[in-house]
Amino acid sequence: MISVLISVYNRFEGLRVTLDCIKRQQCNVEYEVILCDDGSTGLIERLNENGYEDITVVSQEDLGFRLSRNRNNGVRESLGDFLIFLDQDFIVPDDFIQTVYDKRCEKSKICFLYCYLSEETSKKINGLGYESACDVASEDEEYKMKCRILDMLLKQTPRRFPGLFACYKKDFIEYNGFDEGFIGWGLEDFEFDFRWLEFGGRNIVYDRVLLHLFHPYDASKGVISVNTEYYNQRCNSGSKESKYGFFNTLGEDEYEVKYI
């Protein structure tokens, strides 16, 4: 089984776009959808009002930006042996799950490139499938410029590749998952990628660019991550496993699991 883990914090309209993409999937392998919720308001009610079903919602308290713990919680409750990490606000191809799964390889992350769309383009493609959305977005000069840059990255296949990815669950757990010491925006994915490559993992790049819908920038995140010092400490520690992770969570608050 495949577990598709979608990180969520409010912005239900963006989540709906991603869930609708997942509903359209053409996949020969059984998969589950897990929402990793960082303390959204009224999420279950909105899902029920919009008729969504067969979804597992794993929610923790809203105690600030805790993406690492949020994702680890989802993995703890997952049934699949292969994990695909996504965020809300993404538009993916109708065969996304199947084609990602077909590229699977032990000790390998399948890494996703994405193009962050303008507000105007995002409004035009809201509700469209991937192919139609790409057609509309291609009329945007900024989108075309970004895609040219992403195409170069695809050809170069850089060794370092933070961000969203897919991998075998057993490999993720072997590294003790994401480090939950990263509280606040930024660098948890860079640190995981650093450990992954330092201790025998490799990166494979998915061959299509995902679309990321516009949403207002959160000024509280700042330009430089508050986690820079912790990131440097962990990279210099020489440890394969996260300090606080899948097996030893950070924080005393319990998460809640609901099935709809």
Language model features by range: what are they?
Residues 61-78:
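Glycine-rich, basic loop-to-helix element that forms the pyrophosphate-binding segment
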Residues 20-30:
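Short, acidic, metal-binding catalytic loop of nucleotide-sugar glycosyltransferases
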Residues 130-157:
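Short, flexible, basic/aromatic active-site loop/helix in glycosyltransferases
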Residues 95-133:
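Conserved donor NDP-sugar-binding/catalytic core segment of glycosyltransferases
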Residues 83:
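Short aromatic/hydrophobic "clamp" motif used to bind/position activated sugar donors
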Residues 30-39, 58-60:
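Short beta-strand/loop segment that forms part of the nucleotide-sugar
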Residues 160, 181-260:
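C-terminal catalytic/acceptor-binding lobe
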Residues 36-46, 90-91:
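A conserved acidic beta->alpha catalytic loop
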